[in-house]
């Protein structure tokens, strides 16, 4: 586990949603864990992690939360803000993990979409997460602002958007929507059949 707050430069470098993210070989994951009790929720923990040699950050988080004694009678919501979306293998592990914890929900807000050489694997991993009930979205100004005020040693400086933040968020959101679109269409079809009583 890293220190509780990130340095400003590290956050801006790793989370910047630039089109070409050369040299950004680490993945950072900021997280919030909440327990939901009826209409209210309680923050249990927050912090950030980064990948370690030989272990992706998503798997580090799964190891971390596996050590908790999660009460099966309570609902938990985990929110991740990641510098890269999960690779296929991590997506598979996360989906499998969530199957064992039906009382835990996960939301992922990614700064950038990760694709390696096999451009079909990572999109399939994102679809697998979506099928497992994970809410996946691209970070917007609001998410960066929240992260800046929650996870960054900001010395009371206000978060300032960089040039292209909004445009890149829109572009990446469209790309993510195209990846998940077949699943949305199936969901829409199911809802239509349900409405018709079929």
From Swiss-Prot:
Q: How is it modified after translation?
A: Ser-38 is the major site whereas Thr-27 is the minor site of phosphorylation. Phosphorylation regulates its class-switch recombination activity.
What does the UniProt entry say about where the protein is found?
Answer: Nucleus; Cytoplasm
Q: Where are the transmembrane segments?
A: none
User: What Pfam families would the database entry show?
Assistant: NAD1
Q: Which GO terms describe its cellular component?
A: cytoplasm; nucleus; P-body
Ranges where the CMP/dCMP-type deaminase domain occurs: 23-129
Cofactor entry: Zn(2+)
Which superkingdom, per the lineage? Eukaryota
Q: Which residues bind Zn(2+)?
A: 56, 87, 90
What are the GO MF terms of this UniProt record?
cytidine deaminase activity; RNA binding; zinc ion binding
Q: Where is this region: Important for interaction with CTNNBL1?
A: 39-42
Give the Phosphoserine positions (modified residues).
Answer: 38
The record's tissue-specificity note reads: Expressed in thymus, lung, spleen, kidney, small intestine, lymph node and tonsil.
The entry assigns this protein to a family as follows: Belongs to the cytidine and deoxycytidylate deaminase family.
Its assembly, as annotated, is: Interacts with CTNNBL1; the interaction is important for the immunoglobulin switch activity of AICDA. Interacts (via its NLS) with KPNA1. Interacts with PKA/PRKACA and PRKAR1A/PKR1. Interacts with SUPT6H, TRIM28 and NCL. Directly interacts with MCM3AP; this interaction may favor AICDA recruitment to immunoglobulin variable region genes, hence promoting somatic hypermutations.
Name of the protein this chain belongs to: Single-stranded DNA cytosine deaminase
Organism lineage: Eukaryota, Metazoa, Chordata, Craniata, Vertebrata
